[in-house]
Each structure stands twice: as structure tokens, then as C-alpha cells.
């Protein structure tokens, strides 16, 4: 408990922690060596002053050191959002992940249950019949079988149990809202990352560069969504081979129509699962368009599309010819088969 005091004392002066100090602080937190009072004070000191890149990188290093790792193809990617945008849209990144996988890109999706919305990635996938909470071997088997796999934060970041109560009691965003997407258990180097605030796009790009990412698009809708949005412009900060650049995209760039924000609202896991399945069954809707836009952006990140219009064409084709629906079916089957105790390691067909 005493080891946290010097670090808290430094934060109390308004000073920032070095990367090494941040790693030390989060090591203590993840070991359960911080009292509830110390943890709450630490998180709010960072929040009020504003987390630095060194503090984020140091925190991620501590998370990555403890996570249950997953072996994935070198070209695997993640499509994920920070959450916390307050709009409770349906599960755009989850559907985009299925579409992108259907286009031949391995997707190792990392996610959680809902925090600020009614339905997080774990919630909607469970409603669709996907087995959640698989261990590393089971995830690897499903990734090989279906081309997509889901890694739950609870299963792969057990150390987070030490902060769950404090986060719930604080009831506000903390550094943990942005750490999860930076600590993918499969160590992916390619990401489409939705961010809840425009001000975080550049800092997170710099953090991901320091953490070794190859190509990432960080996106924030001008309407506030932590997705590429179809209601208007989306702000993008792209990291590619160490270079960072900022630009905007619009739905028209992908040949898509604009939508009203109300048309993108989600609901319960059952509601969102039904909406997702309707898109996979070919129903034209604003839900389909925003999923296509995000899939198109992800396909650019994956090196499979030269621009949004080509990416949108590939994504739409994967829906219309049934490949995306087939990908979901394969994931449901593979995840349930992989979790059977009698199945030998690596035998998920």
C-alpha cells in the first residue's frame, strides 16, 4: 500500500508520471496493492489533469504483461471502439468485424460487456449464440476455423478485477476506457479504433506508434459517435508505418447515403442481434450502411482496399452473397465446439 504513496504524491503536485512510473503504478494496481482510496484518487488525478502519452503507454505495458495472449496471424486486425460516446447505437464494430472477416481478413476482436450502452460486443454476440469467455487455445481454434474470434476482456485481463468496483463507484470515464482497445490479447498490429472524443485521436495514435502498431485508423464521428458515422463527416487520424496524418471522410466517399442519428440507435442485446441478423440477411437500412462504411475503412487498414468506395463495394458483396452470414454461423459453431471439454486442443474444425 505504501508503494503507491510517492506516485500519488507526485500526481498531487500536478506533475506527470514517466512511462516507467506509470507502469509501476499500474503494476501495483493490477496486483491488488492499492487501497480503494488510493485507486480512486489515482484515477481521478489522471482524469482531471489529463492522461499523457507516457502514462497511457506505461499503463498498457502493465496490462499486456498480465494478459492471456492469443496467437493470431500476422495480418490479423481488430475493429473496436472505446465506448462511452453516450449515444447507445447498435453494435456497429461487431457487424463490421464479421463483414471484414468474410472478405478474407482475420479478425481477432477484443471487447467487453456494455458499460454505457445497453449492449456491448459480448452481449450481442451472446444473443447471437456465440460462446463468450473462451480461453486462448479456444480462441485460436475458432480464429482458424471461422476467420474471426472474440476475446472477452474478463477472460483475458483477469487483473482488471482489481479495478472493477472503483470504476463502477466513480461512475465516470477513466483511463481504463482507452486502455482496453490498446491491449488486444492477440497483439494485432492493424486496427480500426473508434474513439469517444476527437481530442483523443492524436494522442492515441502516438501511443499506438510507441506500442508498435503498423497501421491504424482512429475515428470519431462529428456527431460524437465512436465509429465512422453516416450522419456526416468522420474525423480520422491514421497511423501508417510510423507516420501520422489527419483527415475527414464522409459517407459519400463510400457511395453511401447520409442517415439521421436516431436511425442508428440500438437497444437490448436481443434487439441489436435482430438488427445485425437483418443486415446479414440482406435488408437495406441505415444499420447496413454504417456497417459497410466501417468495414470499408477497416479494409483500407488491412490493405485490401485502395479507398472507401472500393472497400464499400467489397463489404456490400460479402453481405449480398451470404459470406458475412456464413461467417457468423461458423463463429457460432466454432466457439461452442471449442469450449466443449472433450474436444482436444486445436481440433475446432
UniProtKB/Swiss-Prot annotation:
It is an enzyme of class 2 (transferase). Its cofactor is Mg(2+). Its EC number is 2.4.2.18. InterPro entries: Anthranilate_Pribosyl_Tfrase, Glycosyl_Trfase_fam3, Glycosyl_Trfase_fam3_N_dom, Glycosyl_Trfase_fam3_N_dom_sf, Nuc_phospho_transferase. Mg(2+) 2 binds at residues 226-227. 5-phospho-alpha-D-ribose 1-diphosphate binds at residues 81, 84-85, 89, 91-94, 109-117, 121. Pathway: Amino-acid biosynthesis; L-tryptophan biosynthesis; L-tryptophan from chorismate: step 2/5. Binds 2 magnesium ions per monomer. One of its GO terms (biological process) is L-tryptophan biosynthetic process. It catalyses: N-(5-phospho-beta-D-ribosyl)anthranilate + diphosphate = 5-phospho-alpha-D-ribose 1-diphosphate + anthranilate. Belongs to the anthranilate phosphoribosyltransferase family. Homodimer. NCBIfam families: trpD (TIGR01245). This is Anthranilate phosphoribosyltransferase. The gene is trpD.
